[in-house]
């Protein structure tokens, strides 16, 4: 099923707006904080992740999605496994197929790997090596963010996603060419590959091939297209990090539009805390309790709330702190 979206005005200056963070720059901590405050989104270069490693995983991913649907559905499941079109259980659909896996190698259960591939060992190794490398990059980014915020110790954020019980996941998405996405023959409308949403975790890390489609939502409500760059990684601030910074960082709303000519393949690492981790504004970032914008909740509570919502819902709204003024209204 194709989901249509009304055409939107894309600012001409949009391409130059996206912050680019050079991880080799010792002062990048300040640029990271500003990017999280202004956009909740940034591009990372000089990240240290092997290009060969990424290429191998992309090759294996393309091989998997090239299999007959009857074979891919043998590893279908919920929440982990193969899925096609249907996103979640609340009516959201898109022009996408995906493979969702547990990304925590230390949990004991390990990622869900398809056993039907021609070379499952190669795919398994690529997934493990990629996840390990991206996790390390994510820790580095979070620790630089902590430095930029002046928080001690510097592993305040990174330790939440490095715990052996972390609830992190890896998602491989494939957006096939969509003939309906040709706006000249489709009334000027876009076809939605993956509907607009925010990521609930602390932070997410995206890498794609060179096919466009990703868009982020600006504060004025407009959407800007993100030029693809297969050599770089893109980071999204998640809902949990928005809460921990008491709204100083913004969880970016984003979506993917289908392409009429080329396939888009993306890999997203979602860095989540353990299920029992309590999420609340960091006390070092607020002067007093009255400034808190959100109630405390566990990651498990928030995760469950996302399972009961639509993609486009403002899922943080129910956790916003009820002030005396709110109660009087």
From Swiss-Prot:
GO molecular function: gibberellin 2-beta-dioxygenase activity; metal ion binding
Cofactor(s) in the UniProt record: Fe(2+)
Catalytic activity from the UniProt record: gibberellin A1 + 2-oxoglutarate + O2 = gibberellin A8 + succinate + CO2
Protein induction: By gibberellin A3 (GA3). Not regulated by auxin.
Keyword annotations of the record: Dioxygenase, Iron, Metal-binding, Oxidoreductase
InterPro entries noted in UniProt: DIOX_N, IPNS-like_FE2OG_OXY, IPNS-like_sf, Iron_ascorbate_oxido_reductase, Oxoglu/Fe-dep_dioxygenase_dom
Keyword match Iron: yes
Record EC number: 1.14.11.13
Fe2OG dioxygenase domain sequence ranges: 165-273
Cofactor remark: Binds 1 Fe(2+) ion per subunit.
UniProt pathway: Plant hormone biosynthesis; gibberellin biosynthesis
Biological processes, Gene Ontology terms: gibberellin biosynthetic process
Tissue specificity comment: Preferentially expressed in flowers, siliques, and upper stems. Not expressed in the apex.
Family classification: Belongs to the iron/ascorbate-dependent oxidoreductase family. GA2OX subfamily.
Protein purpose: Catalyzes the 2-beta-hydroxylation of several biologically active gibberellins, leading to the homeostatic regulation of their endogenous level. Catabolism of gibberellins (GAs) plays a central role in plant development. Converts GA9/GA20 to GA51/GA29 and GA4/GA1 to GA34/GA8.
Name by which UniProt lists this protein: Gibberellin 2-beta-dioxygenase 1
